[in-house]
């Protein structure tokens, strides 16, 4: 009986040793795991605080009145900014303070890229002030005069006139389709004894339009259709004050051609 008990104890010794080895291996694995995590955290902290985490590329879209550099400065995001310190909504708030900006979307692209998508208020015209052009936006606000005289967006140019009439015209210009708005080169306020709201338009197609502020947008709806009725090369005045008709210019006998369009229906 004694011998059998001894044998049983001896059988258990290898099992105990195996268990101890397994425990030791588990401890080693955990230690390696903890050290690895700690090492990665240290690397991340070093990367976070070093210039390696700075923005490497900033792409700006939709800006006409601000340079890319100005957008970066206003947003607070530059190439000296750490990617992890960029807060998209804060950059958007900074940019929407600009009166020409309607909406902004800032996107972060890991590991070091930023995209800035800008939606500007529609430019409905340029006010000519002593030969310098001042952009007029659909929200009724004006921007600083353009430094180089170049038009960043196609829109009509007009001379300043009575503020009340300007407001009425702005409200009408906002209703125009982009195609018609881009067709207008210049708007002149030219009141007559019969019509204090009279306007003279000079179109990019080379034609002159006589119209009025009242229901201006509705009257101009027919302009693209009228163009199709004009023979190429003809100098024509398009009268949209009452109904719509064209008057040929430069001929010995000026010819009037009635066009069947009811502009106010």
Curated annotation (Swiss-Prot):
InterPro entries: Cell_div_FtsQ/DivIB_C, DivIB, FtsQ_DivIB, POTRA, POTRA_FtsQ_type. Residues 1-30 are cytoplasmic. The keyword Hydrolase does not apply. Residues 52-265 are extracellular. Its main location: membrane. Residues 53-121 form the POTRA domain. It is a single-pass type II membrane protein. GO terms for biological process: FtsZ-dependent cytokinesis. Keywords: Cell cycle, Cell division, Cell membrane, Membrane, Transmembrane, Transmembrane helix. It is found in: Cell membrane. The chain crosses the membrane at residues 31-51. GO terms for cellular component: cell division site; plasma membrane. Cell division protein that may be involved in stabilizing or promoting the assembly of the division complex. HAMAP family: DivIB (MF_00912). Belongs to the FtsQ/DivIB family. DivIB subfamily. PANTHER family: CELL DIVISION PROTEIN DIVIB, CELL DIVISION PROTEIN FTSQ. This is Cell division protein DivIB. The gene is divIB.
